[in-house]
Amino acid sequence: MEWEAVIGLEVHVQLATKSKIFSGAATTFGAEPNTQACAVDLAMPGMLPVMNEEAVRMAVMFGLAIGAEINTRSVFDRKNYFYPDLPKGYQISQLDHPTVKQGKLDIQLENGEKKTITVTRAHLEEDAGKSLHEDFHGMTGIDLNRAGTPLLEIVSEPELRSAKEAVAYLRKLHSIVTYLGISDGDMSQGSMRCDCNVSVRPKGQKEFGVRTEIKNVNSFRFVEKAIQGEIERQIDLIEEGGKVTQETRLYDADKDNTRSMRSKEFANDYRYFPDPDLLPIEIDDAYIEAVRSTLPELPEQKLARFCSEYGLSDYDAGVLASSRAQADYFEAATKIVGDAKLTANWIMGELAKRLNQNSLDISQSPVTAEGLGKLLLRLKDNTINGKAAKDVLEAMWNGEGEADEIIEKKGLIAVTDDSAIEAFVDEVLANNAAQVEQYKAADEAKRGKMIGFFVGQTMKISKGKANPQQVNEILAKKLS
């Protein structure tokens, strides 16, 4: 039997406000435990929440970015449950009246086609604290620094059909929230966490299967592995005659599998009711338009501009526009060197290779955009050749200085004088008379391969300083 996966994601995005959603406590990541929790966060008697307008503005920004409807009246509710890191015994969230209603988001599939995914809603809520297990023997510590940090929970319709589609959707969300500046999107720090709802059904069947929810997956790679593993687990279970249980599961990255955490709750288990301490949020058209006027250029708009303004291919523009930091880096470097294609090739090639090897984002690159631009300027004006440029980039990466300084110190200035290069070529041809005869006797197809030998020997004699293009031109004349 052929099976089909049905996947929906609930993504919790930590908003980049300076203070918490209902208190004035700071939201800085990495502070000492319980140093950023005030009386409101600790649920001390008599403390009342005060709405952070900046969180509302950020939610509206996101809604406008995905073409969603902004609810003119949204209501906060109490979601009641007990957990040690939830001091009040309830979480303030939004149930029936979220700030953002239905929107759309386009993702690109592996085959190059686009697919539109419906975003059901995006609602504001407060984050819980954090349980600490490592430093306590036989006990659990509670850190309430995170309690009350504003979250935007973004819920998709179950329209995703594979683990890879889910990751494409998540990456697109990540791109949007970071472009907007409403979140840093750092999944390693919990700024973006994903709950994955997964079920399977026979292909062609309209009814949904029994779903499981995989909680708090915190990387793109783990989302793909967790969903794919859960799809396979459910199919194996059904084909062996078993039944899928509606439950919450956790992904174990070390064992690369999911394990049962608890039976899945329903909304009525939380006894939602409107929070009497918070008035409904009223959002009028003037406010919405004021927020709309602050929207930055979004990923798809930037991609289109990169194609039209810089003449980049859709693929190159898509890669460079995938993150705001990378797009800004590209434009800053291009402004210096004046060659968009050259800049794109080096960012996506030599620089990306080093970033990936060191698990760094481009914003953490030891080589600045200005530094790369100045290096490529020397490559473009033939001060150095391609091989030397790679050596200079490596030295810059290792903190040895700026491009011009390294070029001078290492003596990498290219030889571009025709007579000097011709002398190198003459020496190579004189030392390889047999190969010259073989070349002249060969057909055009073989000559194309053999010319590389002479180029290589010339570069060797010139200690890599000869301009390869000039070497090729002079060799072609002398061997014709």
From Swiss-Prot:
Please name the GO terms of the biological process aspect recorded for this protein, alphabetically.
Answer: glutaminyl-tRNAGln biosynthesis via transamidation; translation
Lineage, top-rank taxon, reads Bacteria
Query: What keywords are annotated for this sequence in UniProt?
Result: ATP-binding, Ligase, Nucleotide-binding, Protein biosynthesis
Q: What is its EC number?
A: 6.3.5.-
Q: Which Gene3D superfamilies match?
A: 1.10.10.410, GatB domain, N-terminal subdomain
**Which PROSITE patterns does this entry report, sorted A to Z?**
GATB
- Per the record's keyword annotation, is Glycoprotein included, yes or no? no
**Enzyme class (EC, first level):** ligase
Which transformation does this protein catalyse, written as a reaction?
L-glutamyl-tRNA(Gln) + L-glutamine + ATP + H2O = L-glutaminyl-tRNA(Gln) + L-glutamate + ADP + phosphate + H(+); L-aspartyl-tRNA(Asn) + L-glutamine + ATP + H2O = L-asparaginyl-tRNA(Asn) + L-glutamate + ADP + phosphate + 2 H(+)
Q: Which InterPro entries match?
A: Asn/Gln-tRNA_amidoTrfase_suB/E (IPR017959), Asn/Gln-tRNA_Trfase_suB/E_cat (IPR006075), Asn/Gln_amidotransferase (IPR018027), Asn/Gln_tRNA_amidoTrase-B-like (IPR003789), GatB (IPR004413), GatB_C_1 (IPR042114), GatB_Yqey_C_2 (IPR023168), Gln-tRNA_amidoTrfase_suB_CS (IPR017958)
Q: Which GO terms describe its molecular function?
A: asparaginyl-tRNA synthase (glutamine-hydrolyzing) activity; ATP binding; glutaminyl-tRNA synthase (glutamine-hydrolyzing) activity
What job does this protein perform?
Allows the formation of correctly charged Asn-tRNA(Asn) or Gln-tRNA(Gln) through the transamidation of misacylated Asp-tRNA(Asn) or Glu-tRNA(Gln) in organisms which lack either or both of asparaginyl-tRNA or glutaminyl-tRNA synthetases. The reaction takes place in the presence of glutamine and ATP through an activated phospho-Asp-tRNA(Asn) or phospho-Glu-tRNA(Gln).
Family as reported in the entry's similarity comment: Belongs to the GatB/GatE family. GatB subfamily.
How does this protein assemble? Heterotrimer of A, B and C subunits.
Protein known as: Aspartyl/glutamyl-tRNA(Asn/Gln) amidotransferase subunit B
